[in-house]
């Protein structure tokens, strides 16, 4: 039952109800209709995020604060299709355990990327495509920046 699609929410509100219920396996949610995932897991107490790495994010435009203050979140999201993504401000801010930086994301359409990560992050650990797309405000707060290929 792990990879069986059971739920197909039509909007963010329906998706939020599903993700707030820890008895619902994230593998079982088809997110292909969702355009807005902003604050979806903000301050979430959920401990099991298995299956989120397989979500269909091809229509998502907004992931603002999606994992902000989600202290247990730490999944590899490199498989996500981010080609339509425009907003990622505060996306991983204060997600204290998160360290699987998405280095394969398409960020060509990003318009807003304020404080995506915590202020004390070691920017040298970020992939080059994320370094280039972060706003000056993020860079100004970080120390010892060394951008290399």
Locate each region found by the language model.
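Negatively charged
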Residues: 1-149
């Amino acid at each position: 039952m792990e990879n069986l699609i059971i739920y197909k929410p039509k909007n963010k509100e329906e998706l939020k109800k599903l993700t707030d219920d820890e008895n619902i396996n994230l593998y079982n949610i088809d997110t292909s209709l969702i355009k807005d995932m902003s604050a979806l897991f903000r301050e979430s107490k959920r401990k099991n995020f298995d299956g989120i790495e397989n979500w269909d994010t091809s229509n998502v435009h907004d992931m603002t604060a999606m994992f902000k203050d989600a202290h247990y979140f730490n999944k590899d999201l490199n498989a996500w299709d981010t080609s339509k993504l425009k907003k990622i401000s505060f996306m991983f801010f204060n997600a204290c355990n998160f360290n699987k930086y998405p280095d394969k994301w398409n960020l060509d359409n990003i318009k807003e990327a304020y404080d995506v990560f915590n202020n004390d992050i070691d920017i040298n650990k970020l992939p080059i495509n994320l370094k280039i797309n972060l706003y000056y405000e993020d860079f100004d707060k970080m120390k010892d920046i060394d951008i290399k290929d």
